[in-house]
UniProtKB/Swiss-Prot annotation:
Gene: uvrA
PANTHER family xrefs: UVRABC SYSTEM PROTEIN A
Name of the molecule in the record: UvrABC system protein A
NCBIfam families from the UniProt entry: PRK00349.1, uvra
Pfam families for this protein: UvrA_DNA-bind, UvrA_inter
Residue intervals of every C4-type zinc finger in the record: 252-279, 738-764
InterPro entries listed in its UniProt record: ABC_transporter-like_ATP-bd (IPR003439), ABC_transporter-like_CS (IPR017871), ATP_grasp_subdomain_1 (IPR013815), P-loop_NTPase (IPR027417), UvrA (IPR004602), UvrA_DNA-bd (IPR041552), UvrA_inter (IPR041102)
Amino acid sequence: MDKEKIVIQGARAHNLKNIDVEIPRDKLVVMTGLSGSGKSSLAFDTIYAEGQRRYVESLSAYARQFLGQMDKPDVDLIEGLSPAISIDQKTTSRNPRSTVGTVTEIHDYLRLLYARVGHPVCPNHGIEITSQTIEQMVDRVLEYPEKTRIQIMAPIVSGKKGTHKKTIEEIKKEGYVRIRVDGEIYDINDEIEIEKNKKHSIEIIIDRIVIKEGINTRLYDSIEAALRLADGYAVVEIMGDKELLFSEHYACPYCGFSVGELEPRMFSFNSPFGACPTCDGLGTKLEVDVDTVIPDRSLTLNEGAIVPWRPISSQYYPQMLASACKEFGIDMDTPIEELSKEALDIVLNGSKDKEFYFEYKNDFGMTRETWIPFEGILPNIERRYRETNSDFTRDQMAQYMTDLPCPSCKGYRLKEETLSVKVNNHHIGQISEFSINEALDFFDSLELSEKETQIAAPIFKEVRARLGFLKNVGLDYLTMSRAAGTLSGGEAQRIRLATQIGSRLTGVLYILDEPSIGLHQRDNDRLINTLQSMRDIGNTLIVVEHDEDTMMAADYLIDIGPGAGEHGGRIVAAGTPEEVAKNKNSITGDYLSGKKFIPVPAKRRKGNGLELEIVGAKANNLKNVNAKIPLATFSCVTGVSGSGKSSLVNEVLRKALARKLNRNHAKPGEHKEIKGIENLEKIINIDQSPIGRTPRSNPATYTGAFDDIRDLFASTNEAKVRGYKKGRFSFNVKGGRCEACKGDGIIKIEMHFLPDVYVPCEVCHGKRYNGETLDIRYKGKNIAEVLEMTVEEGLEYFTNQPRIARKLQTIVDVGLGYIRLGQPATTLSGGEAQRVKLASELHKRSNGKSFYILDEPTTGLHADDIGRLLKVLQRLVEENGDTVLVIEHNLDVIKQADYLIDLGPEGGDGGGQIIATGTPEKIARSKKSYTGKYLKPILERDKERTEERIATAKKK
């Protein structure tokens, strides 16, 4: 066996055409090719799947059932595999407890740091908490005036389950007469009933004293006895006032604020020892959001200002509101913004104990009369959300609720005691709020004592290394407290990459899926250096990537194609980037050598004279931003990672437009106003989320073509004779579908120690329909055979059916002619799903008042696919007069835009400002813009290429 190569023979996963390929080991290998050409099939479904499967195979059958074994890939032979680690974009944790700090393990090191060198500081008095001497305890008690009655106790059981009989017997032997159990005082000889399954607190009453002169010695002896019995703790109850907790360990000598022994779990918000009890360590509480309940305060109650109580099916709540307003004298025809504070308080929060007469008449004419207090809209929504058994009701109520910072921990997720522990006057929550850059500066300037420095040195080394890795992959703007679920696919992937670098493993096969997604050109070099450093310590990297810089930095480049889907699945070219660039068969090579390129438009559109203006945007890191977007243009928002692009476009603009135009309830990010909405009629967000979550959804159903196809089959003579309607040709309802598999075409067989097996249905043989339905044919094919066609074949087949042909033509236009009409939506990539959505918009008639938003549409797209996508986007603007707004880093897209808005200058707190606006040429001239710096040479290069091409064409 050749130890220098990974040898693959006969790979046939998905669309791979029985290919053989050799991949050099310990090298940076990039796989590229058109979207859908088979890159992921080779990298993830063949190489990674086999590497993972071989590892799982080595485990016992018992262990295998917990791991979910992977299917054996369809391949004849793979040799030279190392243990494989896949870093893709789909495995991001959506757990609200996961943060950047926990995922990268930085938080674990911080917990250790605080447990070893942290100093508890009393939050009430600001003094450092140290262990107290008995003298300090006595002095604290004697501060109370004479004749104050006190009771000295030893807390021997604190919040523990059990009957504690043995403990009480031992107290008896010690000669003590009284004890306090859960706040009640008992004689030691009483029959004390203690429930076994509840938590209890037990204190021995040591002494009862009245403060006066000359009791110092007795007080000293009593406290000493309590400390001895309770392992260094004593409780002094000031009768009729409060209790003081004293500790030989850690407690404030003034107010008794006490911190237990410092240990790492105390600083974890995922542990009951550290988590804030109010929010359970989540940092937020779900509360009803008044602004979502009443989005438009200029409306009156009669005009439906209260959105959740607008009459839909039942009149119950509208009638209740009318009766309450009548009783409490609230005018239902006064706009909400003009109602008195008292009146609005009753409407929102209820009438407390005041009752009103309520007569409710239901739809069946029955009447109910009662006197009840008015619950209030906000408590009503919260109650219905928490108490309902209906998922529908809970989802409806959730629309009006939002996560607000927890009032107890202020969003830091931790207990008050934990947050009292400081290092350099900062608690662990404050350090987690730092960006990666700020954290590096903090640890570099940290001043500790000699002993503490010695203890913390190995911790600092690990923390600095991990922070450095995050900086090197372009994530220095993130904070460690950022929830993992809010990260983009590219950010999450680069975090996992940084974590892997931190592990310093060697001899591993890493498989990465487009790590450059969401990364500005400025940070791309750092990412490439990171990949090369992983290679240099002895790892093999296989990177599925379309970025030109990454391809040119590769040791070995594999181009898979030549086309997509059925037209792909072959190795077109393999070798160094220079060798691939010279290969005449390779489309990638043509783009690398400059034979093919995406041209710069001859002119930039000015728009239709109207514009959309965002005023005073302050969401996340935006610094009171004002931005204008000309309508009827192709505009692009650019800027380094973390500069505020998504905050401006997705958080503020998209949600505000959706709320106004689509009646969506999502609350937009903070902003003053958006002008010019009256010039739009609908907003369409075309993202990369799946077009359907079940295999029953497919491109034909999503674009609406399947409705027309079913109409066509129902209109055939045979179908009319049999009385079949269009519903007969649906695989989702009874009638025409195969009932053995319920229209799925496959049957799932559960295997306990092996992966579930899916077998074709024995009745319909995977065709999804019953025999009678399949008898109906149009132009020689039945409905199942039509669903098996590719879109290109379908277009030819339905060429004389304009309604169907128009819809299929748009799918071909976006470069998806290779997918099958009935291909399950779950098998489409993010880029493919996005283009199916675009196609379904293209065939709709437009009046030029649609606003399209796309967030990084080039994800997963080859330069050739990008060229096709740009033609479609330009068509939406050119033919329909619609507006397209794109968030993008790809310079091929940026150079084609009519108008750019560049945010920056940096990421995180260093961003959130508009650096430059205007045409790409204007941005390229800006000295402050990082985008302009990288755009300028591209514009110059491509203009030269265009001129050369024109000159060559003229000579011919």
